[in-house]
Amino acid sequence: MRAVRAETRARELFRDAAFPASDSSLFYNLSTPLAQFREDITWRRPQDICATPQLFPDNPWEGQVKQGLLGDCWFLCACAALQKSRHLLDQVFPPGQPGWSDQEYQGFFTCRIWQFGHWEEVTIDDRLPCLAGRLCFSRCQREDVFWLPLLEKAYAKVHGSYEHLWAGQVADALVDLTGSLAERWSLKDIRKASGQQDRPSGGEHRACQQLLRLKDQCLLSCSVLSPRAGARELGEFHAFIISDLQELRSQTGQGILLLRIHNPWGRRCWQGLWREGGEGWNQVEPAKESELLAQLQEGEFWVEEEEFLREFDEVTIGYPVTEAGHLQSLYTEKVLCHTRALPGAWVTGQSAGGCRNNSCFPCNPKFWLRLLEPSEVCVAVLQRPRRRLVGQTRALAGASPAPVNLPGKDYQAVGLHIWKVEKRKISLPRVLSAPPVAGTACHAYDREIHLRCELSPGYYLAVPSTFLKDVPGQFLLRVFSTGKISLSAVRLATKGASPGAALPAGEWETVQLQGSWRAGQTAGGSRNFASYPCNPCLPFSVPEGAGPRYIRITLQQHCRLSDSQLHPIGFHVFQVPADGEKQDACSLLLQEPLLSCVPHCYAQEVSRLCLLSAGNYRIVPSTYLPDTEGTFTVTIATRIDRQSIHSQEMLGQLLQEVSFMAVMKA
């Protein structure tokens, strides 16, 4: 934020060069209906849209979400969760920022978005997309309130463009805006489990009763995945907000459960029995009808339980977050006040073992989970989306629109299983051949999957997996518990000679090089990632001699996370061509390495003894995952082959010259 203020001093109002007011911020590949408005969209600041812009209104309803031309109802439904808890809104939209009437106003705002385990600050200018002088994407019920379109712009910046927000999951946006967990209940699956296809089952009724209990604590959303005959007004692939639930009695004494649904489109699209003037109201007293209809705001309507279960496909529920930032259980209302998280990865040919149907399932990443007391535990696996190709505006040159990207395209089918073990030293085949104490019902193409269980004290082995083997990916394992826990990765055994193994006898010249991995700068991760060339590239040379020389290269990390956790590290060595002294590091690192010390191992140090010819080389040390910070030392020991000399003064005994450099003996 300090850098932004410095830039604004040289200009009248801040202009965000990283997310400019241009087509590159609006579109990804012109694959959505948004493309037809390309020539008509202009950018305006709030003070150019209305006379007295404000961030938040005094009346909460005036700040309610309303959808525009962009198909991001999933994101807007999640935004409604922020209005239920002021501390959540303050977390995402830090208070105290200068507004349009303040002297300190400089044309920018800062939001916080939760991304892969961390809250990231996202600063934007306040130029917003408009059509005919009005906001064309999200807006609040009162159009001079701007917290929502500004947050939408920040979220679009995180994703790369507004068009990237077309279609998504409410659950994903809820996690990004709260840092918590979200559950998706398939109403169709609940009905299948009960064996009743024609009418609501006991399981569905219990689900609605649970929604009634949770209505004041967390965001409730419902979605239509395909339209039904006679109810096409709900649309297809559209998300709604469940604003309220009311349990009442009919005039004959029967129980009735009504759900108040808010359509982000901002219009009442429901023509069911409980619409205004509908037949359903004949079942209740006129006074009750008037009371409930008076509660409806723009875009809201009442639906009875049976209609709701018939017409909607899915319900999404966000876990409540306390003011202290702890999750609260949806099932017991207990506070999950102990949290741990660790990153991991599935590496093709190494740790991407696939599901339990595959013989290489034991190769998957494994984690130790220790509980110190009986606890309610939620364990989640959050996938990092595969990065889209760089150059997102390539399709803007006049190419025909590409097919709309479908939700889930960027994610693998992922599952999670947990085994109880007696101690940390185990027979892995024996443990994995037994039934797990907890596991996901199936592998799902969701960004995040999780399971909830009651666990007794002791050690547990958690194994996240993709359904298919040799499918690469990164993930974050998150654990939330009512009791004290510890979480650590199972270390991979380092193959080959140990790092501290003795060198062959003789004289060795040693050189030590210091370096560091810095997120966003020099922490590029392994060669599986496009950011690999960002890693430190350390030069060394082998002098001319009678032939190839023995070289021992040792990489030692100084980035221990705890007594039981180390980063996975490794290195590659590249030979510089004789005519390639001026070759840049990036192009050199795109070639095949001459030798490698991989797979990356959870070890304090790793090393490789090799024979190298005279020439120039580059060592590239790396952690497996990008943006993993730490410092390291690379030690290069070169064998010096010196000829023995005879000395008459020593009566024919052999002497060796003593180098001023370090002498290392076996």
Curated annotation (Swiss-Prot):
Cellular component terms per the entry's GO annotation: cytoplasm; cytoskeleton; cytosol; membrane; mitochondrial inner membrane; mitochondrial matrix; mitochondrial outer membrane; mitochondrion
Domain III 1: annotated span: 322-488
Record carries keyword Repeat: yes
The Calpain catalytic domain, residue ranges: 13-321
Localization terms from the record: Cytoplasm; Nucleus
Biological-process GO terms, alphabetical: autophagy of mitochondrion; cellular response to insulin stimulus; mitochondrion organization; positive regulation of apoptotic process; positive regulation of D-glucose import; positive regulation of insulin secretion; positive regulation of intracellular transport; positive regulation of type B pancreatic cell apoptotic process
Top-level lineage group: Eukaryota
Gene Ontology terms, MF aspect: calcium-dependent cysteine-type endopeptidase activity; cytoskeletal protein binding; SNARE binding
SMART domains attached to this UniProt entry: calpain_III, CysPc
Record carries keyword Coiled coil: no
Pfam families listed in its UniProt record: Calpain_III, Peptidase_C2
Keyword vocabulary terms for this entry: Cytoplasm, Hydrolase, Nucleus, Protease, Repeat, Thiol protease
Tissue specificity remark: Ubiquitous.
Family assignment from sequence similarity: Belongs to the peptidase C2 family.
Name of the protein: Calpain-10
Organism: Rattus norvegicus
